[in-house]
Amino acid sequence: MAAGLRKSVEAINGTPLPHGILNTPCTDVRDVADEHELLGVEWLALGCCPVRSWTDPCGDESPGEESPGDESGAPGTKEFCRPETEHAEPITLYAGAECSTIGWSYAEAREHAEATLALGEQQGLEAAFWRQKLTRDAVDLTPAEGPLSVAQGVAVLEGCLAESYGGVGVLHVPAGAAALLGCCDLARENTATGGLSTLTGNCVIIGAGYSAENTGPGGTPADPGTAWLYITGPLVVRRGPSVTIPDRPGPSVNIRNNDRRVLVERTYVVGTTCTVCAVQVEVCP
């Protein structure tokens, strides 16, 4: 059928994946208006210092009788941990719509750009967090012999997290490897919250943006038939309001070519704590 005879209808709406970084109950998503929080944040790490057991060297001496400032190293001395300052940098995502002014109004261009960001912000944020945090800070636990099975990889990652953090963490899984979590019953859905968790209790994020990246520490691309999995402490996402540029029709038009451009952007700050571990797994053995 000739293009001129086709009837124009509304766009096909989509739905972001239910277990992505913004939709899962694993993530604490906070909509903030304070622009200072959107420039980056820092905090004292909590839960990264170990809680140790103390043995009374005398057997019958009260633990409270020693000086809290004693650094002699003698038997019974208690160790102190200085919490580290952690930080998270801003991530700005945008979607731009470009069209001819003939047949497409400013309102239509704006609506299209805003809908594009709403649908794609989760995927975009996952990809950016993967590049800017996971691949930069992770400890690679892949053995010299090569990639592990998915079950072995999850076990190694959860062990890594447990050694440095005593709370619930987050397992980050590319969408392309997610189906293999069901092979060994590695993730289960909480019927009350709809979230996924492992047998250990760690949350699971399945990311389309993770699958688009699928790189290891340092940005190393995954070998064919493999995928990278990561684990972190809990996540807090600070999300600012979306901003539409320009906010009125006139400035959206380029008078040189009569094209219209509308941009929508939003800033996020994604924080996690204590440790990041990575492992390469086989998805096509």
Q: Model features per residue range: what roles?
A:
Residues 2-91:
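Assembly/oligomerization interface modules of large self-assembling protein complexes
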Residues 84-88, 164-166, 255:
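A generic structural signal for short, non-catalytic loop/turn and secondary-structure boundary residues
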